[in-house]
């Protein structure tokens, strides 16, 4: 059963429940809870300890990142990522299923899906509908901690799926890539503040289009169909046959653009990891666009 879905970006709650019932969890199939919430709201690790998908390990994105960077969620090194996921029992032969508990149905899970892909691991899927629908459908949960046997994971960075500040700056001149921002429209325009952060005005990179990631999800928290997703890209005049860079505030919801494009048959969307957090502090003022009070971000 597992081998039929190794390269699928999404797996259903029904499929995962059947896999757990059939005893498929182990070195060949691992489940990760990648929940993260803004400070002062929900506590991701505490909620995981109280209830999670049976056999799931907690993927702490605060630990699996570049903690030396001044920006929020920058990728860790190859060695850091390899050691971290290896400690969760994941090898290069493991099919990884990622979910989170966000009320939208999915928030941080696509970021972890992309992290695995950018480090060379293709057998990774997002649980469609997330923990929200796992609970709604009455699938089993447990508070029992997962203790997988450590595994060896070799990480190889795929630079084609990652863009740096310098590359995005160069792209303003070359225009080789389309640039799409996944934040809510008000933050993109600069008319609404960036939440939970001081010293970061809202706005966007000059020349970027706006595709709020929430539009990729149904009201019930599932990914929309490939046909619906293609229509969203077409409506924003984003050509899926051409190179594409996704950006947001810190490289998280940009991964929803990468996932949506993947579901439309485009697996090569690159994510600007530093995104607006880095751009705001590094880029020339004329490359930052805002309709806020100052007119510039």
UniProtKB/Swiss-Prot annotation:
Q: Which residues are glycosylated according to the annotation? A: 35
Tell me if Glycoprotein is a UniProt keyword of this record: yes
Q: Which positions does the record annotate as the modified residue Phosphoserine?
A: 38
Q: Where does substrate bind?
A: 187, 250
Task: Tell me the residues on which N6-acetyllysine occurs.
Answer: 14, 136, 163, 175, 224, 236-237
Query: What positions constitute the catalytic site?
Result: 248 (cysteine persulfide intermediate)
Positions bearing N6-succinyllysine? 14, 136, 175, 224, 237
Q: E.C. number, please?
A: 2.8.1.1
> Where found?
Mitochondrion matrix
Under the subunit heading, UniProt states: Monomer.
What this protein is called in its record is Thiosulfate sulfurtransferase
Q: Which source organism does the UniProt entry give?
A: Cricetulus griseus (Chinese hamster)
């Amino acid at each position: 059963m597992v081998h039929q879905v190794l390269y699928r970006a999404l797996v259903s709650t029904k499929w995962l429940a059947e896999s757990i019932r059939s005893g498929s969890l182990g070195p060949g199939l691992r489940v990760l809870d990648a929940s993260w919430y803004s400070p002062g709201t929900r506590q991701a690790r505490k909620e995981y300890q109280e209830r999670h998908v049976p056999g799931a390990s907690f993927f702490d994105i605060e630990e699996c990142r570049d903690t030396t960077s001044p920006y929020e969620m920058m990728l860790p090194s190859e060695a850091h990522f390899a050691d971290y996921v290896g400690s969760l029992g994941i090898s290069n032969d493991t099919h990884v299923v990622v979910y989170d508990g966000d009320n939208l149905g999915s928030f941080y899970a696509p970021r972890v899906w992309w992290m695995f892909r950018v480090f060379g691991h293709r057998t990774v899927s997002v649980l469609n509908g997330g923990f929200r629908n796992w609970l709604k459908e009455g699938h089993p949960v447990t508070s029992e901690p997962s203790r997988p046997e450590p595994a060896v994971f070799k990480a190889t960075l795929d630079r084609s799926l990652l863009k740096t500040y310098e590359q995005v700056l160069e792209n303003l001149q070359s225009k080789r890539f389309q640039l799409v921002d996944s934040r809510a429209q008000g933050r993109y325009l600069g008319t609404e503040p960036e939440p939970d952060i001081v010293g970061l005005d809202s706005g966007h990179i000059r020349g970027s289009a706006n595709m709020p990631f929430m539009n990729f999800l149904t009201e019930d928290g599932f990914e929309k169909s490939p046909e619906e997703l293609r229509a969203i890209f077409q409506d924003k005049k984003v050509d899926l046959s051409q190179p594409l860079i996704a950006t947001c505030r810190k490289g998280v919801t940009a991964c929803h653009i990468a996932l949506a494009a993947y579901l439309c048959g485009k697996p090569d969307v690159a994510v600007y990891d530093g995104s607006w957090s880095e751009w705001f502090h590094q880029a020339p003022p004329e490359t930052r666009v805002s309709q806020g009070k100052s007119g510039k971000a």
